Every structure is written in C-alpha cells, then in structure tokens.
C-alpha cells in the first residue's frame, strides 16, 4: 500500500489540517482519564509545528445528538487542555469548526501555532459525508493530513470527503504505523504466525477468522466465543454464553482450519462461576466440559500455558479480543497472562485495538509491544480485509 506521508511534503507557511482522533474518555469533572489517543497523534503534530506549518486540528468526541447540553458535554476543551500540556505550548480552541469566526482564527494563525477546531460532530453533515460541509472544511487548509486511524473505517466529511477538495494530502505517522504493522502481520508475516482471537461473539469475528485461516499457522480462541466452538464439537458448556444460531458456522470454521492445516486451539480447561459477577465463587474446571450450573468466564491455567507456548514459539503474534471477562478480577488471569507472554516475546507483537489494547494499557505493557493499534473497529475491518475509506483516499 503506497501511502504518501506528511514528511514528504513541504509544509512551511502552509495551512495544514490534520484529522486526529481525540475521542478520549472523560470523568465527571470532564478531565481526560486516558490520553493515549492524544499522545499517539503527537509525532505528526510536532512534525508539522517544526516544519513551520499553521496547524489546524479536527476531531470528534462522543456522539452528540443535537441536544442543548451537548455543547458542554461533548466539547473538545479537555482535549485542548491536555494537548497544550503535552506540547508545552498554547493550543487555541475554536468555538466551531466552520463559519466566519473559524476562518478569522485560521487567517490569524502564525507558523508553528496550533488551532483545534470544536467537535466536528456538532454538525450532522460530518457523519453524512456531506459534500458542502467537506468543501467548507477544505477551504480552511492547503494540505489535508489524515492521522485518525480510529475513524479510518468511516466515510465521513473530515476522514474521507475533504480529500476531493484539497490539492495536497498525506497520511500522518500514526496511520503510517498502523498500516505498516497491521499490513505486515497480515500480508507477509514472519513465521510461525500465531493469532489469538477472543471476545464474546463468533458473529463479531467471522470475517477476521476467515481471513486469518488463510494466513496464520495457529489460531488460539478465548473469550465467550470459545463456548460456541466447543458446543459445536459436542462438548458440554454448562450455562456458558453460546450463539445457538452460529453453531453450524463454527463447525464450518473448524473444518476450514483443518483443511488448511491451521491449528485452531480451543480451551482445554476453564475458570467458571455461577454468574458473571466478581462476587461469584471462582471455580477452576480441569476439563474441556463445563458442568451444569456453571459458566465459563475465563480460560483455565492449562489453556493459558498452551497459548503461552504458542506465543513463545512464534515470530509474529496478533491479538484481538480478551480471553475472559477481564474487567472483573476473578476472570482476568487469562487476558493478562496472554498480555504478559506477548510482552516477554521477541516476536513482532501486534495488538488489534479495542478491549485487548485496553488490557495491555491496564497492565502497563504498551511499551513492550511492537504495536498496539489505536483503532477498535478500524483495526478489525482492516484485518477482515476490508477497504478503509480514510486510507483509500490517501493511496496512490
């Protein structure tokens, strides 16, 4: 995939619009509780500042629905404040993203200054990829840079539509890194290539599994989706979560893996409880079958050892989806055990966004991984082999 990146452009004196992903979690006092996405955009922003660009940043935050208190609830003000601290320079926050007031702020921008536009989703035209809105945003800049991998799977005005109305466009360093690592893991991985796939539903991961069966040497399954596979094999799963309407599909996936000589590993023991609560008694079931009255809530110690061994032997490891209900302590060992094993591995370790990225962050192991994706849905669609609109418009 040939992407032109921001460092290939002369930015001096130019108005450079960078689409970032500052969709960050906030507490009740509207303080940023996790600034990972802001920090992920810093290399691109700092490059533009040092290249003497007039830097204009655009992002969304949450899902405003046009209610009167939305302006306060979904304002990017907390992100502007955190960015200012990280850059150690003032960040100007506009009170809108289009209009005469914004145009004046852009006109007054000096080289190396940073202007953050207010939440793009305050305008419903953003998500509709409205041509007029995209054109109006494009009038603010000479160069358009997309560095928002988290929204690259959305064809919105600022993530894709603007590209048609600017002469110069490029990918930021974050998108470059995402495409490079996810693309390498799926395109030309060093072997053995092991994938760990977890999460609640087989239905969420069908395309991912189909794509990985064509590429991986082994796939380790965890999370609640494992019980649908086990039941499809005729194994008793107690009251574990099962997608009854996906049993035939699970059988087909198992057959396909076997036909392609891909080792598809399922749990051989389980950590169970009577209900999915952290107050439930933690029962280790030392068998593939789960007794009636119990539900599987995490992979068991023997399974974790098997999966660890696969990680140790691998040259490339890709992980997407938790191994259990890791948000609750009694059921978190499998997920954090996998994270630990990947952190200690010399292999190319790629974590595909969402809950797995959150687990790696919580365990303080981000720096030990080769790449932790910033995009939940976007990384999933990339792994499914789908075209991402926000990247497609940058190709060539």
From Swiss-Prot:
Binding, substrate: 21-23, 37, 60-63, 121, 154
Metabolic or biological pathway, per its Swiss-Prot or TrEMBL entry: Carbohydrate degradation; glycolysis; pyruvate from D-glyceraldehyde 3-phosphate: step 2/5
GO biological process: gluconeogenesis; glycolytic process
PROSITE patterns, A to Z: PGLYCERATE_KINASE
Name of the top EC class for this enzyme: transferase
GO cellular component, as recorded: cytosol
Keyword field contains Manganese: no
Family membership: Belongs to the phosphoglycerate kinase family.
MF terms (GO), sorted A to Z: ADP binding; ATP binding; phosphoglycerate kinase activity
Protein name: Phosphoglycerate kinase
Pfam families: PGK
The EC number(s) this enzyme carries: 2.7.2.3
HAMAP family for the chain: Phosphoglyc_kinase
Keyword Transferase tagged: yes
Catalysis: reaction(s): (2R)-3-phosphoglycerate + ATP = (2R)-3-phospho-glyceroyl phosphate + ADP
Residues given in the record as ATP binding sites: 205, 296, 327, 353-356
Assembly behavior: Monomer.
Ranges in a coiled coil: none
